[in-house]
């Protein structure tokens, strides 16, 4: 411990930190104990050390137990409605991926089989739950997670984001801990938007389509990426972080509008001549049923290059959500919209009552807009706007009733007032 003394204007003694030896004039705060002192900088350092040790011990205690595919699927059920087959495919793929990492951490013998990485492609209509599935998986496994938008990516040297910026975002999520980032999950959204216009090789330079697919190949398969620590474009004077992407799980997702037609064209192809099998053009299948017949060759025909499709061996297709599924999404998940709005109104000392016909009307509106589950919140916000504007200023509102006529815009939500004598009700006047 440091034992410095000197002259001070007040008491003739200059105080020093017993740990780092800095004087009271060199630090912002000096805390006194029995015959010792500690400065604010040393307190911060101690807090950081304790925090790191707690995180390490937590990781070690939970790291041994990897949830089984069935447990993963059951957890996904709490947040995502329907999509049973997609959940099963995801659960098995993610379980095998992290089981592979556990094997990789142990010492390998000469005869050990090397397990390859299986990245995932999610194909489904907009608002069917692709992003939510990936987010829930990352939260369940307690690994770093980031979402990248494929439409903003360009080849290196062109205006736009380099593909390495995806890894830089992942590093940001885990405070630039490279080891942690190397076991994370990256979700690349709108992957269908980087498809080339035809399945023939492009003659002209396609810097945001086929060029991006080429740039993503090595990153997805596994390479040591040089990432600028503060993001942005690379320059020679900058030091880079080296991140091995070989153990990062890449999940790519896209709506692939028109892919069902590509699948139908392939499956309905017949021979020629009298013995050719004649197939009906209208089989009555919906988009979800058609997507289940997806083959890698359909993705190539759609505009993904064969090498890119080969890097995504696990394909999970999601069904289009029907009205019943949308109603269930509104009220069943842990973070459902009904529960969220109930909590918001509860904070104002009142409750909100969504009638069943109201939820069906919301689901019906979302289906008409073809926005899937993503459009549910905007409908609810629009319907409850006036009510949420007035409630904080009103007194004694104990209940808000929302029925089908409110969703259709025919009437306003009913406010129930609690008085000492009885309860009275009136509609919210429109602005």
From Swiss-Prot:
Q: List the InterPro entries.
A: AAA+_ATPase, ATP-dep_Clp_protease_ClpX, ATPase_AAA_core, Clp_ATPase_C, Clp_protease_ATP-bd_su_ClpX, ClpX_bact, P-loop_NTPase, Znf_CppX_C4
- ClpX-type ZB domain: from which residue to which, for each copy? 5-58
Query: Which annotated residues bind ATP?
Result: 125-132
Molecular function terms from GO: ATP binding; ATP hydrolysis activity; ATP-dependent protein folding chaperone; protein dimerization activity; unfolded protein binding; zinc ion binding
Q: Which UniProt keywords apply?
A: ATP-binding, Chaperone, Metal-binding, Nucleotide-binding, Zinc
CDD domains hit by this protein: RecA-like_ClpX (cd19497)
Q: Which SUPFAM superfamilies match?
A: Glucocorticoid receptor-like (DNA-binding domain), P-loop containing nucleoside triphosphate hydrolases
Matches recorded under Gene3D superfamilies: 1.10.8.60, ClpX chaperone, C4-type zinc finger domain (6.20.220.10), P-loop containing nucleotide triphosphate hydrolases (3.40.50.300)
Residues bound to Zn(2+) are 17, 20, 39, 42
Which Pfam families does this entry report, sorted A to Z? AAA_2, ClpB_D2-small, zf-C4_ClpX
Any GO CC annotation of this UniProt entry? HslUV protease complex
Gene Ontology biological process: cell division; proteolysis involved in protein catabolic process
* Top-level division of the source organism's lineage: Bacteria
What does this gene product do?
A: ATP-dependent specificity component of the Clp protease. It directs the protease to specific substrates. Can perform chaperone functions in the absence of ClpP.
Q: How does it assemble?
A: Component of the ClpX-ClpP complex. Forms a hexameric ring that, in the presence of ATP, binds to fourteen ClpP subunits assembled into a disk-like structure with a central cavity, resembling the structure of eukaryotic proteasomes.
Similarity annotation: Belongs to the ClpX chaperone family.
What name does UniProt use for this protein? ATP-dependent Clp protease ATP-binding subunit ClpX
What species is this protein from?
Saccharophagus degradans (strain 2-40 / ATCC 43961 / DSM 17024)
Phylogenetic classification of the source organism: Bacteria, Pseudomonadati, Pseudomonadota, Gammaproteobacteria, Cellvibrionales
């Amino acid at each position: 411990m440091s034992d410095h003394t000197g002259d001070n204007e007040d008491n003739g003694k200059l105080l020093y930190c017993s740990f780092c030896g800095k004087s009271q004039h060199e630090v912002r705060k000096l805390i006194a104990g029995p015959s010792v002192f500690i400065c604010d900088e040393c307190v911060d350092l101690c807090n950081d050390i304790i925090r790191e040790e707690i995180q390490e011990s937590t990781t070690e205690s939970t790291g041994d137990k990897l949830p089984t595919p069935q447990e993963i699927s059951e957890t996904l059920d709490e947040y995502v409605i329907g999509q049973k087959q997609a959940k099963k495919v995801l659960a098995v793929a993610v379980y095998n991926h992290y089981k592979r990492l556990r094997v990789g951490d142990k010492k390998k013998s000469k005869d050990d089989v090397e397990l390859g990485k299986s990245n995932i492609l999610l194909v489904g209509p907009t608002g069917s739950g692709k992003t939510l599935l990936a987010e829930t998986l990352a939260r369940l496994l307690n690994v770093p997670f980031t979402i990248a938008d494929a439409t903003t990516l360009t080849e290196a040297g062109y205006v736009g984001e380099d593909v390495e910026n995806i890894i830089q975002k992942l590093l940001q999520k885990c405070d630039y801990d490279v080891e942690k980032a190397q076991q994370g999950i990256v979700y690349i959204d709108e992957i269908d938007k980087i498809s080339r216009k035809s399945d023939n090789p492009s003659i002209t330079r396609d810097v945001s389509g086929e060029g991006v697919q080429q740039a993503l190949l090595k990153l997805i398969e596994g390479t040591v990426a040089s990432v600028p620590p503060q993001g942005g474009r690379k320059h020679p004077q900058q030091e880079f972080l080296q991140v091995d992407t070989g153990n990062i799980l890449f999940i790519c997702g896209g709506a692939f509008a028109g892919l069902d037609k590509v699948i139908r064209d392939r499956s309905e192809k017949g021979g020629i001549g009298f013995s050719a099998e004649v197939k009906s053009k209208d089989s009555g299948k919906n988009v979800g049923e058609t997507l289940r017949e997806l083959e890698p060759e359909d993705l190539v025909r759609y505009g993904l290059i064969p090498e890119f499709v080969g890097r995504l061996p696990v394909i999970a297709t999601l069904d289009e959500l029907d009205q019943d599924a949308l109603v269930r999404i509104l009220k069943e998940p842990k973070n459902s919209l009904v529960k969220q709005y109930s909590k918001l109104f509860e904070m104002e000392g009142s409750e909100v009552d969504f009638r069943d016909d109201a939820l069906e009307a919301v689901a019906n509106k979302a289906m008409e807009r073809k926005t899937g589950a993503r459009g549910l919140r905007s409908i609810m916000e629009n319907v409850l706007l006036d009510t949420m504007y007035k409630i904080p200023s009103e007194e004694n509102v104990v209940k808000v009733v929302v029925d089908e006529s409110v969703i259709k815009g025919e009437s306003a939500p009913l406010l129930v007032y609690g008085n000492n004598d009885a309860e009275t009700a009136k509609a919210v006047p429109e602005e």
